[in-house]
Amino acid sequence: MKLELIHGRPDSVDGRLKKEIRTYDLLDELGIPYERIDHKAAETMEACAEIDEALAPAAICKNLFLCNRQKTQFFLLMIRGDKQFKTKDVSKQIDSPRLSFAPEEYMEKYLDITPGSVSVLGLMNDTENHIQLLVDEDVLHSEYVGCHPCINTSSLRLKSADVFGKFLEHVHHGYQVVKIDTAEK
């Protein structure tokens, strides 16, 4: 079954979560165009291959929700899907103690997102700026970025300039660029 790329929001909100609709509402309010694919839940990068193909040429990102050992600093790391996260390398670049994956309860508390749905668009729910956004430099070089609208049964293709410009400005978040090497084969 070929996935269909649709311009804009769904025609109906039936069966869709409020957080997904809030995402479309905000993108529309900001005048950010997007294309959408609806699909079965995509919880791993491996399950995303067909989605990635349909969203091409977007940089499909792994979005990792991280924290320090004390759980006092939280980070959302956007890296290309073909790269591996090495905590030592990223921790050194941001001058932070060793990072690890943050517990699910903080993901829900700060981003209103569940595992498998982590997305830069979840920053719209982080109104008190608990989360620091880290972006792999290669993601910034892509014309488009692919991400979830706060739910993993849809994926969006947005212009990178809109995400890292209009969207982040509106939600009062900046970002720090990190360099992550391509995984060795």
Regions found by a protein language model. Give the residues of each.
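Extended, low-hydrophobicity, polar/charged segments
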Residues: M1-K185
